[in-house]
Amino acid sequence: MSNKAVANRYAVALFELAEEKGQTDVFERELELVQEVFETTPQLETVLAQPGLAADKKQALLRDAFQAHLSPAVMNTINLLMERGRYSEIVGLAGEYKQLNDDKKGIAEATVFSVKALSDSEKNQIAAVFAPKAGKRELRVVNVVDSALIGGLKVRVGDRVFDGSIQGQLKRLEKQLVAGQ
């Protein structure tokens, strides 16, 4: 089973529990904290990967680091991953959980490629226009500057791409011209 599939299984189980308790956003914030610690402290994963360190010591390390900041359900999920030797799935669990919570709320992330950095106002306008097209209530816009676009925008929401860039228009024109010969 792939790492993403494993992380997703745990995320689904934790999300269902969070829904029952009415704490989906609380659990998301807690998992974001865990993810941030793992991403900013690469030594933590190195220590957890040590085969010579007993599993109970690894669990104790995480319990000492997180127990004061996490609800019992989130802490138990992390302990379960540790017991099963799946410490590397903890960060993936956080990402999968966030995706589930966003889907439930009708929120998606949009990557907007543009020639120049977009202002907050422009990001808000893009979110307002593309959220209904993507079937979402709200979009979080992440701007990526790409000078190869020449002009215009390219918006990616999940697997869908809306290409209004000059580069994209030139490519489509080229295909039409080649097909017409």
Swiss-Prot record:
**Known Pfam families for this protein?**
OSCP
Asked whether the keyword Cell membrane is assigned, the reply is yes
Q: Which InterPro entries match?
A: ATP_synth_OSCP/delta_N_sf (IPR026015), ATPase_OSCP/d_CS (IPR020781), ATPase_OSCP/dsu (IPR000711)
**What PROSITE patterns has UniProt attached to this entry?**
ATPASE_DELTA
Query: Which SUPFAM superfamilies does the record match to this protein?
Result: N-terminal domain of the delta subunit of the F1F0-ATP synthase
What Gene3D superfamilies does UniProt report for this protein, alphabetically?
A: N-terminal domain of the delta subunit of the F1F0-ATP synthase
Task: Answer whether the UniProt record assigns the keyword Glycoprotein to this protein.
Answer: no
Q: Which UniProt keywords apply?
A: ATP synthesis, Cell membrane, CF(1), Hydrogen ion transport, Ion transport, Membrane, Transport
Q: How does it sit in the membrane?
A: Peripheral membrane protein
Any one Gene Ontology molecular-function term assigned to this protein's record? proton-transporting ATP synthase activity, rotational mechanism
Instruction: Name any GO cellular component annotation.
Output: plasma membrane
Localization, UniProt: Cell membrane
Q: Which domain of life is it from?
A: Bacteria
What is the documented function of this protein?
F(1)F(0) ATP synthase produces ATP from ADP in the presence of a proton or sodium gradient. F-type ATPases consist of two structural domains, F(1) containing the extramembraneous catalytic core and F(0) containing the membrane proton channel, linked together by a central stalk and a peripheral stalk. During catalysis, ATP synthesis in the catalytic domain of F(1) is coupled via a rotary mechanism of the central stalk subunits to proton translocation.
What family name appears in the similarity comment?
Answer: Belongs to the ATPase delta chain family.
Q: Which PANTHER family match?
A: ATP SYNTHASE DELTA CHAIN
Q: Which NCBIfam families match?
A: ATP_synt_delta, PRK05758.2-4
Q: How does it assemble?
A: F-type ATPases have 2 components, F(1) - the catalytic core - and F(0) - the membrane proton channel. F(1) has five subunits: alpha(3), beta(3), gamma(1), delta(1), epsilon(1). F(0) has three main subunits: a(1), b(2) and c(10-14). The alpha and beta chains form an alternating ring which encloses part of the gamma chain. F(1) is attached to F(0) by a central stalk formed by the gamma and epsilon chains, while a peripheral stalk is formed by the delta and b chains.
Would you tell me the protein name for this molecule?
Answer: ATP synthase subunit delta
